[in-house]
């Protein structure tokens, strides 16, 4: 019998080949256990509100008024909403062509893009053009749009850091391109060695692959490191020499938990370097409302800014964006509020600062608690989370555990994470889902569980790990191939 169009066997092979570990086997098993009544702690996704982070008050007030503009005509509105929230709601409604239910320009509302440009100028000290900023349904959609323009076929390669966020591997696979890995150095706090980049490019070219772009994730996901200014300079010189477009995933730029290495944007470093390099390197920078102290993942708000991209290429990207008509308009309002929050003297300023600082300070404490907790466990080592929302400990698995995983038909770190899930309800992501060096095993967990629950979670992990290591202990120690 002949196959129908959507029978599994006749599906697009790119769809079948792409994998997304963050919602893979572990997540599916966790969902099954939850249906059976087991308490599950979903630390597999950087989803702050799902783990109890409270929304910031001011942006929710503004968007509520935008969603229900009839409230603005109520004579009692000033008794419920502060005057600055009312004023901002009127401002954003005036930017639309018919409220939040009307399509915007396919690049996003011009007024919001102007606010994003002003934010970038304040952050970096260099001009930003609203015409080169596109608002998107989360940063992920922007990444997919740009990769779609870069990848022409299977012989086009994208340099991606390993460990990497599987958005990149999945999208590259879906678009029919080739992922070219470059490995971060765990012993150097997940630093980047440009020599490794050169080797990766040379190896790819020897296989007939044309490397066209490089991805950096700063701060890192899943690794949690912040790139130094010197490292970013090296990367930009490398991209200039190799004529690569640099994709700067900077969605965690608010999530910084130490003072020694602040976030520095790729654009600022590029502009600081001056001509000719500042005029040569093609750069796309991404940001979102989903991370930081906002954590508005479900709103799906993001943007990308283009630097040194030719006008005709910008027109083509605009054309492709137009196919989807309009990004989510309420999310565009959230983006405007993120880049232009209450200012000193505004009625809502003190509350906004209190809420945002409280979230960041708590995340900093949780990052330390989780790192210290992992490092107190047998056969577990973990670099401190400098930024982002994750810990990425290395699990030194005994050879007996590796053999047991093989017999069960599982990758060793998947085997470990499944056992952890079954025993404790903690849902993590195995390091193999992000890529890692051969014979080395990790897991990724968010640092997002409520601060008051963190000691119990880490105690539960330690108890499980001690029992696991005792059960599979052998005379050969752990794997460090």
UniProtKB/Swiss-Prot annotation:
Pathway: Photosynthesis; C4 acid pathway; Amino-acid degradation; L-alanine degradation via transaminase pathway; pyruvate from L-alanine: step 1/1. One of its GO terms (biological process) is biosynthetic process. It catalyses: L-alanine + 2-oxoglutarate = pyruvate + L-glutamate; glyoxylate + L-alanine = glycine + pyruvate; glycine + 2-oxoglutarate = glyoxylate + L-glutamate. Keywords: Aminotransferase, Peroxisome, Pyridoxal phosphate, Transferase. InterPro entries: ALAT1/2-like, Aminotransferase_I/II_large, PyrdxlP-dep_Trfase, PyrdxlP-dep_Trfase_major, PyrdxlP-dep_Trfase_small. Its cofactor is pyridoxal 5'-phosphate. One of its GO terms (cellular component) is chloroplast. The modification N6-(pyridoxal phosphate)lysine is found at residue 291. The keyword rRNA-binding does not apply. One of its GO terms (molecular function) is L-alanine:2-oxoglutarate aminotransferase activity. Expressed at low levels in seedlings, leaves, flowers, roots, and green siliques. It is found in: Peroxisome. A motif (Peroxisomal targeting signal) lies at residues 479-481. Its EC number is 2.6.1.4, 2.6.1.2, 2.6.1.44, 2.6.1.-. It comes from the Eukaryota. It holds the Pfam family Aminotran_1_2. The N-terminus is blocked. Its main location: other. Belongs to the class-I pyridoxal-phosphate-dependent aminotransferase family. Alanine aminotransferase subfamily. Homodimer. Catalyzes the Glu:glyoxylate aminotransferase (GGT), Ala:glyoxylate aminotransferase (AGT), Ala:2-oxoglutarate aminotransferase (AKT) and Glu:pyruvate aminotransferase (GPT) reactions in peroxisomes. This is Glutamate--glyoxylate aminotransferase 2. The gene is GGAT2.
